């Protein structure tokens, strides 16, 4: 497996891998990483579909990429913010047929939609019960805070192992709009991994200027289950891939001899019946280890979601622990799943039932939410919320079967253990109705109307996810297994807890990248895997981000010590009349 960039590799079709007709594949899980692996086995690996078996413990595919209507109402556990430089994602989705537009791909639909209706937030944050917080596109960070960010950007990864963000930043960063934007957009907490924070900065340096108003982002038409998962599953079924639902993989055994590692068997359980499936070197095994939505609990309008981080037999954490016990190269799951109080947050899906609540939404987002176009344009953060509440409406309808007079709102709170500002209870102890009341309070609904609207004008379903931020926990090298560990001959790890270079977790791209790299490595496919977009090596992006992070202030306006000011003045003299001076002026750096 090797990385590439450019159209030469991107548009090429690889030759059929040697011996692939004699191979089969077992894929544990049906999340985005697993489905991506299956799609690449079919498209580029040219494996027969009936040789591919997707094993899923739940009754539906998709993993964390969900969006369903239950008896209790619509539920979206999360949402996906996407980037034009998700290179693997677009490499695959260009080949997945649309379910709605004949002759078009999922990428075509997505591209046309975001061209016609580009994303932009008109109100990034509120305070004082629905008043615009007037962040006004500003990062509001001091020169000292900017230097802390720059220092992290250039700190070697080796020095950031097991470090927290609080080990690097202080209140110069934490009190800024920058941190409010960052932590709520990506769900970072102050105690999370400084290494991952650095990777994010480098990965999305080209989008720094688009963070305050979300012009950097793109979204799907519907929820991600309907817009991404269903087309992928349909593509796979059309190629004969087998899906086994409500089937747990409770154990994987490995034969490890010298430097060679082979997955030798998997134990599956279906309807209480357990079976051991032996594996040969020609049986490829793809393992989704860990899981950000494991142990999640769903509430209802009149029921709290609760908080139960118990790791149950057959879930992703339990399986990874059994696997990790067999070899040090298989990672250290305890680094991620041992402190659920530090890795949880709670979300809720609020469905409006009449025209009473939408007027308050419209006042804040400054758009009509019923047009089918962009509404909030990303999350609206309630700056003075004790839960640090954020909420969003993507294009409506979010579900194909959603009534046209209803809206589906996604709400989440980073601090599920704190009492609310109106409902004096921790979010995790609140029913859907109570979470809706807290949200309505922060929308600016008159207090005398809040209970009535939460009761009769909305249906709210909360979801508690104890491990949703587990991948952000401080880590060291080796805590996540390599996608294909050294010496592995027939297995690979997939998803957010598998290790690949430079990319960032909690993204669709990371999951899909692990799936592509796993297949390309095990089948030795002779085509390049698209490298992570290289904006971190592009001096144009670096200078542009530096200026925009400082709200347009020039380098010459920095609060520098006397000696550094003199040095800068001398440098500017040296470059006078050169292309370098012209370049810096073009990007408003001087």
Regions found by a protein language model. Give the residues of each.
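Short, glycine/acidic-rich hinge or "gate" loops at secondary-structure transitions
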Residues: 103-111, 245, 527-537
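Amphipathic alpha-helical segments that form well-ordered structural scaffolds
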Residues: 88-95, 181, 227-238, 434-442, ...
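Beta1-alpha1 glycine-rich phosphate/pyrophosphate-binding loop at the start
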Residues: 1-3, 37, 41, 45-84, ...
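C-terminal segments that line or cap access tunnels to active or ligand-binding sites in enzymes
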Residues: 206-220, 282-284, 289-514, 520-534
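Rossmann-like flavin
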Residues: 99-206, 217-219
């Amino acid at each position: 497996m090797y990385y590439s960039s450019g159209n030469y590799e991107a548009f090429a079709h690889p030759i059929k891998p040697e011996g692939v007709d004699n191979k089969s594949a077992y894929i544990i899980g049906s999340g985005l990483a697993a489905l991506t692996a299956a799609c690449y086995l079919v498209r580029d690996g040219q494996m027969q579909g009936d040789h591919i078996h997707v094993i899923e413990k739940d009754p539906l595919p998709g993993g964390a990429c969900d969006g369903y209507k239950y008896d209790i109402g619509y539920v979206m556990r999360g949402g996906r913010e996407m980037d034009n430089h998700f290179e693997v994602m677009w490499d695959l989705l260009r080949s997945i047929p649309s379910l709605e537009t004949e002759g078009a791909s999922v990428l075509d639909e997505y591209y046309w939609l975001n061209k016609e209706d580009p994303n932009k937030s008109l109100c990034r944050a509120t305070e004082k019960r629905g008043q615009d917080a007037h962040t006004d596109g500003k990062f509001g960070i001091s020169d000292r805070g900017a230097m802390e960010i720059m220092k992290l950007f250039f700190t070697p990864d080796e020095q950031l192992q097991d470090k927290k963000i609080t080990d690097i930043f202080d209140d110069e960063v934490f009190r800024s709009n920058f941190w409010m934007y960052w932590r709520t957009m990506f769900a970072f907490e102050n105690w999370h991994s400084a290494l991952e924070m650095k990777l994010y900065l480098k990965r999305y340096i080209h989008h720094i200027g688009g963070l305050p108003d979300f012009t950097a982002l793109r979204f799907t038409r519907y929820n991600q289950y309907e817009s991404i998962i269903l087309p992928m599953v349909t593509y796979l079924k059309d190629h004969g891939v087998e899906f086994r639902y409500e089937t747990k993989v409770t154990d994987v055994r490995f034969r490890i001899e010298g430097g060679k590692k082979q997955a030798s068997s998997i134990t599956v359980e279906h309807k209480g019946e357990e079976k051991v499936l032996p594996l040969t070197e020609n049986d490829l095994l793809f393992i989704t280890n860990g899981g950000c939505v494991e142990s999640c609990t769903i509430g209802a309008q009149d029921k709290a979601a609760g908080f139960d981080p118990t790791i149950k037999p057959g879930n992703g954490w339990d399986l990874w622990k059994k696997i990790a016990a067999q070899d040090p190269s298989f990672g250290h799951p305890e680094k991620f799943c041992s402190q659920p109080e530090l890795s949880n947050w709670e979300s809720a899906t609020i469905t409006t039932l009449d025209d009473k609540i939408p007027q308050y939404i419209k006042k804040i987002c400054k758009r009509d939410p019923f047009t089918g176009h962009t509404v909030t344009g990303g999350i609206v953060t309630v700056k003075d919320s004790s839960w640090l509440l954020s909420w969003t409406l993507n294009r409506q309808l979010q579900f194909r079967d959603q009534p046209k007079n209803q809206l589906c709102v996604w709400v989440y709170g980073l601090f599920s253990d704190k009492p609310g500002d109106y409902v004096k209870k921790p979010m995790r102890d609140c029913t859907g109705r109570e979470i809706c009341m807290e949200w309505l309070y922060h929308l600016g609904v008159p207090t005398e109307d809040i209970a009535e609207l939460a009761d009769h004008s909305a249906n709210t379903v909360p979801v508690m996810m104890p491990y949703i931020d587990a991948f952000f926990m401080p880590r060291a090298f080796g805590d996540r297994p390599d996608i294909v560990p050294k010496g592995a001959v027939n297995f690979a790890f997939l998803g957010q807890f598998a290790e690949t270079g430079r990319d960032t977790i909690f993204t669709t791209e990371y999951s899909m990248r692990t799936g592509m790299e796993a297949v390309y490595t095990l089948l030795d496919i002779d085509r390049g895997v698209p490298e992570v977009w290289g904006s971190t090596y592009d001096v144009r992006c670096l200078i542009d981000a530096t200026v925009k992070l400082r709200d347009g202030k020039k380098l010459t306006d920095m609060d520098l010590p006397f000696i550094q000011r003199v040095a800068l003045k001398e440098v500017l003299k040296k470059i006078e009349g050169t292309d370098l001076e012209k370049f810096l002026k073009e990007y408003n750096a001087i």
